[in-house]
Each structure stands twice: as C-alpha cells, then as structure tokens.
UniProtKB/Swiss-Prot annotation:
Subcellular location: Cytoplasm
Record lineage: Archaea, Methanobacteriati, Methanobacteriota, Stenosarchaea group, Methanomicrobia
Protein encoded by which gene: metG
GO biological process: methionyl-tRNA aminoacylation
Cleaved signal peptide residues: none
Protein name: Methionine--tRNA ligase
Family: Belongs to the class-I aminoacyl-tRNA synthetase family. MetG type 1 subfamily.
Matching Pfam families: Anticodon_3 (PF19303), tRNA-synt_1g (PF09334), tRNA_bind (PF01588)
HAMAP family in alphabetical order: Met_tRNA_synth_type1
One Gene Ontology cellular component: aminoacyl-tRNA synthetase multienzyme complex
Segments for region (Disordered): 558-598
PROSITE patterns, per the entry: TRBD (PS50886)
Length: 710
C-alpha cells in the first residue's frame, strides 16, 4: 500500500443543530469521525479534529419563541448538552465552538464580502412568503406548502418529505403560515443571490477528479450538477444570525454561515494551540468532512463553490454515512422510533465503548444502519465478550497469577506476521472509510490469539516447563498489547484499562500503531486484570425494548388524540443528522392542529380482520417471571384441550393475584415468542392512554372461555 501522506489533515463533523437532544442517528457521523481521527494519529499524522453547534436558522427562532426564551439562551442549553455527551462517548474535539461565536461572524463576513467583491453575489427582487395575519415575512421553516417538483408537502427551503430538492424562496405552491395556520401570500422584496450556476463546470471537474471520500457523496452531487444548477438565495428575513453586509434587516442563510463554522473552529483551535489555520484553508492541507447522507448537496455543491469563489481551499474528501433505522423501522421522533443517547443509553449504565463498537462494526459506513437492542446484545456478547474480552482477560489473568510480570520470551514469526497483517488491513480499511472492515480485521487478530492460547494449553504446559510456558505467555501478552493499540480508536476507554494492566508506559492514545511490533520488556509488572466486557443479559435488553415500545405507544396515542401533526420529522436547517423541528406555535399558546394533518391508520378489508383469532380467556394462574420486573406468566383457558401460556408486561399495573379468575381478551394466533426465556403463545390485549393508565380488556358480562370476538 502507498505511504501515508505527510500533509496535515483536518477532520470535521457535520454540526449538530442546537435545537434538541442527541440521539443514535447523530452518532453515525461523530463516532466514525472520531475513530478515523484517532487512527490517523496512530499512523503519525498531524491531525486536527473540529466541530461545533449549528446555532442559527428558523427552527431555533421558532422553538425559542415557543419556550419564551431568546435563541441564544436556547442554543446555550443544547450546545452544552452536545459537548458533554460527546465527551461521555469518548469523542474529543480539538475545538467545539458555535456558529454564533465572534470568529464565525467575522469569517462569514470576510467570505461574503469577498464573494461580493468578485461579482459572485447580486441583488434580485423576488417573491417572499408573507403572512398578512401575523404581519411578517415567512422564511424557510415558517412556511409550508406543496413542492413544485413532486407535489409533496414541503417547507420553504427544502422538499424534505418528497424529492429532497432545495427550494428557493417563492417556489412553494399554496403557502401556509406555520405560525397561525392561515394562508400566506407572496410579496416582493430584494434579496441577494450567489452565482452558483457559474461554478457548474468547475464542480463537474472537481467532483469527477479531485474530491475523495465515499462514492455515494460524489455520485449524488454529480447527478445534481448534470441536471443544471440555479443561483442560490443566501439571505433571509430574520434577526437571529449573521447580518448580511449593509442590510441589518437581513441575515445570511444558515447554509452559508454554518459550514464556514469549520473554518472558524479551526481558527479557535489555532489560537489556543499556537498553530496555523491557514495550513488547511489557504494551503494544501487535507480537509475531510464527515456528514450525514442527507446533507450531501450542501457539502458537495454549495460549499466548495463558495470556497472556490472566495479563494479558500476546498474539501479533499466528503464521507457521507447511510441513514439509521430503529428496530428496522424508519427513524422518526414523532412516531417514537428514536433512541436517545443520554436517557436511553448512558443513563442505563451501558458503556460508551459498546455503542462505539456497534456503530463501527454493524455495516459499511455508506449503508443503512439498523439499531436494535437485540442485535447490540448479540454483537457484544459474541464478539467483544467472547472473542476480544475473552482473550485479553484469560491471557492477562493467567500471566498475572503465574508470573506477576511479563515473562522472558521472543516474538514468534507466526505471531509477528498476524500482527503485521492486521495492521496493514486496518490501515487500508480506515483509508477507505470502511470501518467495519477495519474492526473485522482487528477481531480476526483476537480470534487468532484465542486459538494460539488454546492450542498451547498453558495450564498444562506450566506444570511441565515453566520457561516454555513463559514463551507462550510472552507472545500472548504481545498480542494483547497489539490489540490494545489496534482497538483503541474504536473502544478507547476499555483498551486504556487493558494497556495499564499490561504495565505499559506512556499514553495509549498517542502511542503509534508501529509500537505494536516493538518487543515487550520482560519483567514489566502486570496488574490484576478486570473483566473488560460483560454480557448483556436478557432482562436489561427487555427493559430497553419495553421503554421503546412505550415510547411508540405514547406517540401513537398522541396522534390518535389529535396532538401530532401526522408528518415525518423534518431535517432542521443545521448540519448534523436529521433533527425534527417542533410545529410552529403562536407565542403564548399552543397552536391547534389542522384537521387534515391528523394521522389515522390505513383502512383494512374485512378479510384482514378475519385473520385474527381473538377469543375470551379465563386466567387460571398468574405469577411473576423471574429475572424481570415487568413480566407476568399467565395460564389461560381459551376453550382448547390444554391451557395457553402467555407472558404479559403488566407487573407495573396489576398484581398477579388480581388477574386470577378474570376473563380477558386473547389474540390466539400470534406467533409464539420468548420473553426472558419464557414462551408466550399468544397475546393478552390491553389498552393504554399513552400515559400511566393501562387496562386489560375484559368482557362486561360472564361468557365462556373460547368465545370468539367477531
């Protein structure tokens, strides 16, 4: 493989929008970027890793109005939240600023003025959505209507629910004010445009020949350029944001000042580190952007055109991730299909390294990632626990008990070759942003270690020849050292623990990959090892699944009650993975949902209902399920020769003895499922109000078991 570049490299992440909490979808960008930056450092590269909160745009103004606070107060809360969450997950930026920092205001004005001076920005009178009732112009998120391209419901600047195209002010059909729900009209006003169309030829060449990264980003962007580019309105009618030069009534569009944040945050880092930001943005340093796939257009078209026009360096690579599903369902906060990083994962005591491993090893970075608590359990138990953790613990415990230090020995050629092979494969995979391949290669080395340990049977060898056993343990401990270095980018906290137990000097996080082949020093004192990874038990996973189920039920109940808008969450104007903006509400009170937006389930044919075997059952026995705080095992008579065993999550609402003798409603032909190891042959039906009330369904008259519901 070619020698790595000696150029300094800047790694950035799409900015999280300071308008809501961190969820699993966010981490598809930030964790792989952190892994990549750590890996580059282990190759000896000069790496700077920056990010920050995206703090401007209409969604923040809307939400601040709803909460009765200023936009600045709102973003301060969420900026702190993201900063703390990233650190808890082991994601450490060299600078983590905000787009409202003075550095970003100054850099944005510098670039915009430069574009004006070079003739790339011009004024144009256009039609802007205006609400006569609210007496205000309606930029972006303040207006909704029909997309002129596909007819789907869209917001003012993007068809986020349909074709995904960027929309210019005035393009939206049948505009409606999202503040009051009334019809909007178009009025003329002067705004400013960037001559994006003049960069078509440049972008075609840049995307085809110069831009690295993932092929999905390049191909999407090339497709848009081939369709033809139109000039881009870069001003908005807002008070919150970076003021457009010479026009205090206008701010620059959030997609202008947000990516410029990359430069501003580099400046902030340089000022603290006594280094140069220009080595990236004015010279030939490498710039690698990690983004969610839904913001490819902005990073591969708008952004490089602006940079080229203002005489700044353009990105070297854009790495776009695939989307995220939750339990095989489309990610949707409004539908409850979401996993919150804080309240769902970290607050329940799950180690950050487990989630980092899952995100890196589940699938290729460009493919869709499904987050499932069961798959998490399987991957952690069968891979981290049974392979990597097993090898490290058994090796270090045996060595500690029998030697107390690194025994004398030499690195065997076979072991050296396996380490060299793993290093080569990991570096190559990282260079291609194939994090799963890198993890698979690293795990193969751990598997080799287990095989090596097992085949030499040190527990027998030590009884016959302690020196020969020491040679085996020396090689096992050297493999452990190599694994600490190779896995550090993925599971940094756990590997740091193992590194210290091996008695290694120096900071694991700054030690290079090359050190994996430096011989261990015999006589180095070992510490008693800890179990690095423990199995995720069924009851913990079932608890999380129940939390997820209750969230979905609550969302369904909210919509059924007419409190939801029935729409998929929209991509906020920020740069991070999809953020849902709250429906606009009039200051001082909640807006009433429009009737046409209430969601109902689709109509079904009678034949669909007839497929359900729903019967009355009599509860004969009910008892708690061991290892679960929520489940009850129920024996029920439903008119068959034998009783049915059901498992119901009702412990929080009924004592088992309360159910005995009751007539209940049972779905009898539901496929069997195991819960906490207990088989459930059907489902006992219950109702909930989306809050704290849950009620088992029971007939109001005595009726024999087995009676069918028709």
């Amino acid at each position: 493989m070619p020698e790595p570049s000696s150029k300094p490299v800047l790694v950035t992440c799409g900015l999280p929008y300071a308008n809501g909490k961190a969820h699993i979808g966010h981490l598809r960008t930030y964790v792989p970027a952190d892994i990549y930056a750590r890996s580059l450092r282990k190759e000896g590269r000069d790496v700077t890793f920056v990010c920050g909160s995206d703090t401007h745009g209409t969604p923040i103004v809307v939400n601040a109005e709803e909460l009765g606070i200023t936009p600045k107060e709102l973003v301060e809360v969420y900026h702190k939240h993201f900063d703390e969450t990233f650190k808890q997950l082991g994601v450490y930026f060299d600078a983590f600023g905000t787009t409202d920092d003075p550095e970003n205001h100054n850099r944005t004005l510098d670039i915009v003025n430069r574009l004006i001076e070079k003739g790339y920005v011009y004024p144009k009178t256009i039609e802007i959505a205006y609400c006569p009732k609210c007496n205000r112009f309606l930029p972006d998120r303040y207006v909704e209507g029909s997309c002129p391209h596909c007819g789907e419901i869209a917001r003012g600047d993007e068809c986020d629910q349909g074709c995904g195209k960027h929309l210019e002010p005035g393009e939206l059909l049948n505009p409606v004010c999202t503040i009051c729900g009334g019809p909007a009209e178009y009025r003329q006003q002067e705004h400013f445009f960037f001559k994006l169309s003049e960069f078509s030829d440049y972008l075609m060449d840049y995307l085809s020949n110069d831009l690295g990264g993932t092929i999905n980003a390049r191909n999407y962007a090339l497709g848009w350029v081939k369709q033809g580019l139109t000039d881009w309105c870069i001003t908005r009618n807002l008070e919150w944001g970076v003021k457009f030069p010479g026009h205090d009534d206008l701010v620059v569009y959030v997609w202008v000042d947000a990516p410029i944040g990359y430069i501003a945050f580099t400046e902030e880092w340089a000022a603290k580190a006594g280094d140069s930001w220009e080595k990236f943005w004015k010279n030939d340093g490498e710039i690698v952007h990690f983004i969610g796939g839904d913001i490819t257009y902005h990073h591969c078209i708008f952004w490089p055109a602006m940079l080229k026009g203002a005489d700044y360096s353009v990105p070297t690579a854009v790495v776009a991730s695939g989307m995220v599903k939750i339990e095989d369902k489309k990610f949707s906060k409004s539908r409850g299909n979401v996993v919150w990083v804080g309240e769902d994962y970290l607050s329940h005591g799950f180690h950050p390294d487990l989630l980092r491993y899952y995100l890196a090893s589940y699938t290729s970075h460009t493919k869709e990632l499904n987050f499932s608590w069961r798959v998490l359990q399987e991957k952690i138990n069968t891979e981290l626990v049974s392979v990597l953790g097993n090898f490290l613990y058994r090796t270090m415990l045996f060595a500690f008990k029998n030697y107390g230090e690194v025994p004398s020995g030499e690195l065997e050629p076979e072991v050296r070759e396996e380490i060299e092979k793993a290093l080569k494969e990991v570096k190559a995979a990282m260079a291609e942003y194939e994090f799963k391949k890198a993890v698979d290669s690293a795990m193969s080395l751990a598997s080799f270690g287990n095989t090596y340990f097992q085949s030499h049977e040190p527990w027998n060898l030590i009884k016959q020849d302690k020196a020969a056993c020491g040679q085996v343990l020396y090689n096992c401990l050297h493999l452990a050292k190599a694994l600490c270095l190779i896995f550090e980018p993925v599971t940094p906290g756990s590997m740091e623990t193992a590194w210290k137990e091996l008695g290694q000097e120096g900071d694991l996080h700054t030690t290079l990959y090359a050190d994996a082949l430096v011989p261990l020093k015999a006589g180095t004192k070992l510490a008693k090892p800890k179990i690095l990874f423990t199995k995720l038990e069924d009851d913990r996973i079932e608890e999380m699944e129940e939390i997820a189920n209750q969230r979905v039920k609550a969302a369904d109940a909210k919509k059924a009650a007419g409190k939801g808008n029935g729409k998929e969450p929209t991509k906020a104007e920020g740069m991070g993975p999809a953020e849902e903006a709250k429906p606009a509400e009039k200051a001082g009170g909640a807006a009433k949902p429009r009737e046409e937006e209430k969601e109902t389930l689709p109509m079904i044919e009678y034949e669909d209902f007839a497929k359900l075997d729903i019967r009355v059952g009599k509860v004969l026995l009910a008892e708690p399920v061991k290892k679960s705080k929520k489940l009850i095992r129920i024996e029920v008579d439903i008119g068959e020769e034998k009783t049915r065993q059901l498992v119901a999550g009702l412990s929080s609402y009924y004592a088992p003895e309360e159910l005995v003798g009751k007539s209940v409603i049972v779905l009898a032909n539901l496929k069997p499922a195991k819960l906490c190891g207990v088989k459930s042959n059907g489902m006992m039906l219950a109702a909930d109000d989306g809050g704290e009330i849950v009620s088992a369904l029971m007939p109001d008259k005595e009726i024999k078991p087995g009676s069918r519901i028709r």
